[in-house]
Amino acid sequence: MFSNGLSKLIKSKIASTSIITTKNNYSISKLSFSSTSILLNKKYKLSEPFNYEQDCEYALKEPIQFWDEVASKYVHWNKRYEKVYSGDEYNPEWFKGGVLNACYNALDVHAKDPITKNRIAIIHETPSKNNTNKLTYGELWDEVCIFARGLHNLGVEKGDRVVIYMPMINQALIAMLACARLGATHSVVFGGFASPQLAQRIEHFKPKVVISANFGVEGHKINCYTPLLSKALELSSHKPNHTIVYNRLDVKLDAGEVLPPRVEGSLDWSELIKNIAPYRDYALVDSTHPLYILYTSGTTGMPKGVVRDTGGYSVALNYSIRNCYGMKSGDTFFAGSDVGWVVGHTLSVYGPLMVGLTSIIFEGKPTVPDASTYWKLIEKHRVNALFSAPTAIRAIHRDDADGKLASKCDLSSLRSIWLGGERLDSSTFNFLRNITNNKPILDNYWNTESGSPLITNPSCQVPIKANATGKPMPGYQFHVLSPTSERLGADKIGEVCIKLPVAPGFTNTLYLNPEGYKNAYLNEYPGYLRTADSGYYDENGYYHIISRVDDIINVSGHRLSTGSIEEILVKHPKIVECAVIGVHDELKGEIPFGLVVLKPQYKDCAEEVENELIKEVRENIGPVATFKKVLSVNRLPKTRSGKILRNILRKMYNKEEYTVPPTIEDMEVLKEIDIEFEKYKLSHPPKK
């Protein structure tokens, strides 16, 4: 990431600086740069308007000056940082000494400006219920400050922790921003998770307060949150001081739909904020203060708590929203994601609001009431950019194959469509190009850890190349490495890794598990952060992301651990052992497939056990797992040391080439499994 321009940035008062030179790259060890000691290289400055090549060169040659200029230009600091960068490449600290507030940067700067105060900030849409709810920046500011007062009255203050378990409604954003205003760290849990998953996060995070809603709307279905929350609170040994439930009045229930029961001892959101004054103060937090913790699937059953700092994240968002997505103040952005995921945090809440956009908050499914739902919303609100998982577009394509429904909608306001969360397939790409009259359709690679785009097509300035993910964002250097840490050349497949140190906004630790962070990301390849994604770059510098290299599978853009599913399966009293793999699915991209070995006395009741296992996974992880495929086999392929060959099983099912390791215990097992796979596929043909 850093280059030889660093030598120009250091004044004599900065001691103990070590610059290690390598071919075309420079590494840094234990250095720091004061914001007042930067010797500006007048050759470089932030491009205006944005120019991808120019900013790439600037960030490569003068990285400290580059990020200092971004931070100074776009972020409101109550106290300017003393050092742009300090620490070392394995533990970078950005904007040390800086003091700010994320809520102030997202709301106050707009609500206090007479030009933007009455601009629409968020639009909540529930199409299946024909429900729309808009809030201006001034109104959202009021709502957030009032709820912040309610939390403050309950004793929530800087450094406290709050869990938010809510559907995609305005109140979810209000809760997040109120926490940020008070300096409390929030952890949003995806509403599709079942009670055990929620309990696990409450247990680990130990929040002072849990905030939820009584129900959410998913397509034509009402999802009840309070029964799941009650069960989670029962399962968790940690008991929060308070539980707040927003009882919705914005949606009219249909005949047969019943309000869920209340959570025992919970506080009603509306009663909590009744007749109280807005909390206009805001907590000043350090740049490194954790804005939020977001749990993501780990390679074992315990999810990883990704820590997001306030200062670096604010800087990264301001830069990427403007210069990756090409958005400017007053534009409208529609991210078809959930606030329980990083895309929701970045592209529905903090990113759009910090830049002064209008953000569409979508509650529902893209094919309900019909496959024109997204396109009608784009026409209705004159949306300028759409972000979606390919899965959602595949579902739309399935229900509107020739694009007739889409053709009835005016998409002229749309400047670009961004796809992320999983690999973009050519069929989805071509469908979107056809229905949008060849508007830019752009892949978008990033992850929970980065918090913002890594490889993409910034502001549509890179020629679109079929099947390529794109090129790195300014400020990032990527290399493709072999298992022995050798840098691979063009068109050679390996693990895609990031040259250290990482840019602002990228997590540099896991909550309560710093050693786990090192083991997961830093120890495998010295000098690099591993992404656990395989891929390659071509002769023109385009990166191609292929698949995960670990046991994380990607279901409709949701990352799930196969290990967590295995833990549920193996608890069944009739199961000896099991393996869960990710298999291709036309609609969802990838879904889990379970192979189980039954105890001998239960061989005759395989179908019964398989149905029980599907039910268990649904109850313990939730419908998000899409676990519907189970196959009983006599034995599993293993190495002589007892390791199950999951990767080979996955490739066998998906009809991919594979290499049998010399350490395999019994080759005959693979033949047996292959026969069983073919039988299964014949008896379970894909749905049309």
From Swiss-Prot:
Enzyme Commission number, as recorded: 6.2.1.1
UniProt protein name: Acyl-CoA synthetase short-chain family member B, mitochondrial
Locations listed in the record: Mitochondrion
Listed GO biological process terms: lipid biosynthetic process
Disulfide bonds: none
The reaction(s) this protein catalyses: acetate + ATP + CoA = acetyl-CoA + AMP + diphosphate
SUPFAM superfamilies: Acetyl-CoA synthetase-like
Organism taxonomic ancestry: Eukaryota, Amoebozoa, Evosea, Eumycetozoa, Dictyostelia
Main localisation: mitochondrion
Alphabetized InterPro entries for the sequence: ACAS_N, AMP-bd_C, AMP-bd_C_sf, AMP-binding_CS, AMP-dep_synth/lig_dom, ANL_N_sf
Assigned protein family: Belongs to the ATP-dependent AMP-binding enzyme family.
Gene Ontology CC annotation, any one: mitochondrion
Entries under PROSITE patterns matching the protein: AMP_BINDING
Functional summary from the UniProt entry: Activates acetate so that it can be used for lipid synthesis or for energy generation.
UniProt enzyme class: ligase
One GO MF term attached to the UniProt entry: acetate-CoA ligase activity
UniProt superkingdom: Eukaryota
Keywords in alphabetical order: ATP-binding, Ligase, Mitochondrion, Nucleotide-binding, Transit peptide
CDD domains noted in UniProt: PrpE
